[in-house]
């Protein structure tokens, strides 16, 4: 099933039109915008791999029964309730983020380069920040994260093995590569398949976005899309 879905989705292609006045608007047709970073992602990857057996936990394991299926999806939280709580605070009985008391978690001491980079993004407030691992051969079946436009989660590729793809059903492949951060509209149907022999590591940042970072990503997408 995942093979057929990807075959159809990869036939689709999105090209950016005029720069939107407000990329968060419900009628905006941009599924993503991206920016490329000049940072030591090889060093970050080494830090992250060192956490392997000790800290990564299965992410959204209950969704295999109650929602969409996935295989080989693991995570560790860098900013949140604690390193093992990888889902939204309401899954753990909290009514607000303030009650959940998000903090930079204990694993951050093992990831100095990674955390320094994340703090340099200039968010005025960090919400959940997680490393998401998709095992070699792993996949996340087609789904949406909710109704309407859900633009803003920032997905940064620490690595992105050849053969590992994130696709939108109606917009085709998202051009991830090592060192590229992508703001995504997760209200659109999407799926991920790591059809490679290498584990994939991305970081997802939620929070109050640095406006300059977002605007730079929009301009960068408009100027470079289809060229790299």
Place the predicted regions along the sequence by residue:
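Short, conserved beta-strand element in jelly-roll/cupin
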Residues: 133-135, 148-163
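A short hydrophobic beta-strand segment most commonly corresponding to one strand
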Residues: 152-158, 181-183, 197-215
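A short beta-strand-loop-beta hairpin characteristic of the jelly-roll/cupin
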Residues: 157-177
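Asparagine-centered strand-capping/turn motif at beta-strand->loop junctions
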Residues: 191-196
